Amino acid sequence: MPDYRSKTSTHGRNMAGARGLWRATGMKDEDFGKPIIAVVNSFTQFVPGHVHLKDLGQLVAAEIQAAGGVAKEFNTIAVDDGIAMGHDGMLYSLPSRDLIADSVEYMVNAHCADAMVCISNCDKITPGMLMAAMRLNIPVVFVSGGPMEAGKVKFRGDEKAIDLVDAMVVAADDSYTDEEVAEFERSACPTCGSCSGMFTANSMNCLTEALGLSLPGNGSIVATHANRKKLFLKAGQLIVELAKRYYEQNDASILPRSIATKAAFKNAMTLDIAMGGSTNTVLHLLAAANEAEVDFTMDDIDELSRRVPVLSKVAPAKQDVHMEDVHRAGGIMAILGELDRANLLDVSVPTVHEKTLKDALDKWDIIRTEDPDVYEFYRSSPGGVPTQVAFSQNRYYSTLDGDREKGVIRNAEHAFSKDGGLAVLYGNIALDGCIVKTAGVDESILKFTGSARVFESQDAAVEAILGNEIKAGDVVVIRYEGPRGGPGMQEMLYPTSYLKSKGLGKDCALVTDGRFSGGSSGLSIGHVSPEAAEGGAIGLVEDGDTIEIDIPNRTIHLNIDDATLAHRRTVQEAKGWHPKEERKRKVSKALKVYAMHTTSAAKGAVRIL
């Protein structure tokens, strides 16, 4: 039977000094021998998805104490991708994921914590904490801050639901007045919480449900609803139970690596494809699997994408549907329930809250349960009042959305499409693969052939788009924006949004070794691997080259002969793999260190050891 890790610093005469310090934090004689639970918070006033988390760590801590544990809270950093977007701040977003993972490891191992509750929410925070959980392999429960409510705007006689991306698109569209743009801006993000669509933050919080590491509703119930408080209270109680099961009953089945097995990662990716999640989730699942020492690769993702249907379309794929609508339809447990009925899941895998995923679905899938409390939970609705306060309203929808033919969540028979919302493409421009969010691509351009317009940075591409230099039929190629080349693998939300603003959302493609925001849609192909800085063929594309994209057949092809491609490679290798034009970009020492040690997107942009 394993000893409590905390015993290292709480027992023995040689630890008198450490115990003295523990006492100075409030511990008493009776606390030594109890499990020490790290409450890993990520409160910050910089990020709307985290601004309401300040007191929630202590809410969880109180439940831990009441359940017989000792709670000790610390904070991680949290970068807001939306605020960091469109300037050099975005260089820091992806590297912050690894910094968060390291900081959690440092704090938990330095202080010998026995277990942890991870309070996350936005884009890189959940992945960073997930990587740390897999690395540490101690009992853990994830609980996120929750989605913000969708914005509402009365525009030219109609009321519509909007989000951050809508504000960005109209801001670059000259047909809107300054007053109209300001109204979108004021209305887009009305409450605390992660941005309201199926963007990266919400995608990752949904995936923790599928991985079995968080409670039902974690990914979907809005941050403002009183029922979300129940998740935090339950997390505090549950983590003490899990810690005692492992350390006092020798039950290793509740450890993260026992729960997040390859089968669980495949379940999570199956969910991701079915709900049209952010392409960033591919990076993060690959990275988490790497930490868990699970053999989960791009090939697994490719195989799943060919047979998993799209069962839900949420903004940005369907602009009038947001996470609050997914919750009303039964949340993630409902999507998993439909996938189970289509025989696309392994429901024998365990979770932190039920013995198996099957047991969880029997209890929480609104189609199969008869529990009125579950029905009420999923009727939790937005409050419609701007606020930065968690759990501040208690409104309910009058009915659930159980329509599986035309509703927000469909069954497999009535799927939006028969193959997945994410796809892996291969070809001579992406030998190790690239990713496209097919759920956000119009059917008319699933096959697309166009002429390359090559840019050595996101900034240059944005300037060309806003300057009306991009025309229908162009393939915008943005390179040297990968994990090494950026460095930091910037998101390309501005270029995709501006293409929409110019009316080119269905007439152009964008191909990059960078990545896309979860808010991006359109024919946006990212994570091209190998990246240009690694000698990838994207670094050999020239203006005017023809690029053929065939999503149904999962191919992307630079239409030049092998001899020409080989000649270009010889010339480029002599010059070195770097942008042809000098970029106005300040790369700090921290970013240079990141660039030296990161791998390609095809491997999750994890570090080389």
From Swiss-Prot:
Reaction(s) the record says it catalyses = (2R)-2,3-dihydroxy-3-methylbutanoate = 3-methyl-2-oxobutanoate + H2O; (2R,3R)-2,3-dihydroxy-3-methylpentanoate = (S)-3-methyl-2-oxopentanoate + H2O
Entry's cofactor comment: Binds 1 [2Fe-2S] cluster per subunit. This cluster acts as a Lewis acid cofactor.
Record's SUPFAM superfamilies?
A: IlvD/EDD N-terminal domain-like, LeuD/IlvD-like
**Does this entry carry the keyword tRNA-binding?**
no
State which gene encodes it: ilvD
**What are the annotated disulfide bridges?**
none
Q: Please name the catalytic residues of this protein.
A: 517 (proton acceptor)
**Sequence positions bearing N6-carboxylysine:** 124
| Official protein name in the record | Dihydroxy-acid dehydratase
- Biological-process GO terms, alphabetical: isoleucine biosynthetic process; L-valine biosynthetic process
* One Pfam family linked to the record: ILV_EDD_C
User: In UniProt terms, what function does this protein have?
Assistant: Functions in the biosynthesis of branched-chain amino acids. Catalyzes the dehydration of (2R,3R)-2,3-dihydroxy-3-methylpentanoate (2,3-dihydroxy-3-methylvalerate) into 2-oxo-3-methylpentanoate (2-oxo-3-methylvalerate) and of (2R)-2,3-dihydroxy-3-methylbutanoate (2,3-dihydroxyisovalerate) into 2-oxo-3-methylbutanoate (2-oxoisovalerate), the penultimate precursor to L-isoleucine and L-valine, respectively.
Tell me the enzyme class.
lyase
Which family is this protein grouped under?
A: Belongs to the IlvD/Edd family.
Q: Which residues does the record give as [2Fe-2S] cluster binding sites?
A: 122, 195
**UniProt keywords, alphabetically:** 2Fe-2S, Amino-acid biosynthesis, Branched-chain amino acid biosynthesis, Iron, Iron-sulfur, Lyase, Magnesium, Metal-binding
Q: Name one GO cellular component term.
A: cytosol
- Look up the record and name the pathway of this protein: Amino-acid biosynthesis; L-isoleucine biosynthesis; L-isoleucine from 2-oxobutanoate: step 3/4; Amino-acid biosynthesis; L-valine biosynthesis; L-valine from pyruvate: step 3/4
| Cofactor(s) of this protein | [2Fe-2S] cluster; Mg(2+)
Species this chain originates from = Acinetobacter baumannii (strain ATCC 17978 / DSM 105126 / CIP 53.77 / LMG 1025 / NCDC KC755 / 5377)
